[in-house]
Amino acid sequence: MKANIHPNYHRITVVMTDGSQYTTRSTWGKEGDTLNLDIDPRTHPAWTGGTQTLVDHGGRISKFKNRFGNLGM
């Protein structure tokens, strides 16, 4: 096996949208970093069956609507 090809695997804290948090191991960030979620399994419409509005990060939803909004579906 090749040495030093795998990313660093360390502990981080994940904060859910309701403020609850848990510690897990990840390759994201650095040891001890905190990952704040914008949407999680408790609030995502795909898992809750709700009709909450999606957060438009980087204008992706707006860009899609501008491009395909005139299809009239």
Swiss-Prot record:
GO cellular component assignments: ribonucleoprotein complex; ribosome
Keywords: Ribonucleoprotein, Ribosomal protein, RNA-binding, rRNA-binding
Membrane-crossing residue ranges in chain numbering: none
GO biological process: translation
GO molecular function: rRNA binding; structural constituent of ribosome
Pfam family name, one: Ribosomal_L31
Record InterPro entries: Ribosomal_bL28/bL31-like_sf, Ribosomal_bL31, Ribosomal_bL31_A, Ribosomal_bL31_sf
Membrane in keyword set: no
Function comment: Binds the 23S rRNA.
Annotated family: Belongs to the bacterial ribosomal protein bL31 family. Type A subfamily.
Protein name as it appears in the record: Large ribosomal subunit protein bL31
Organism name: Bartonella quintana (strain Toulouse) (Rochalimaea quintana)
Gene: rpmE
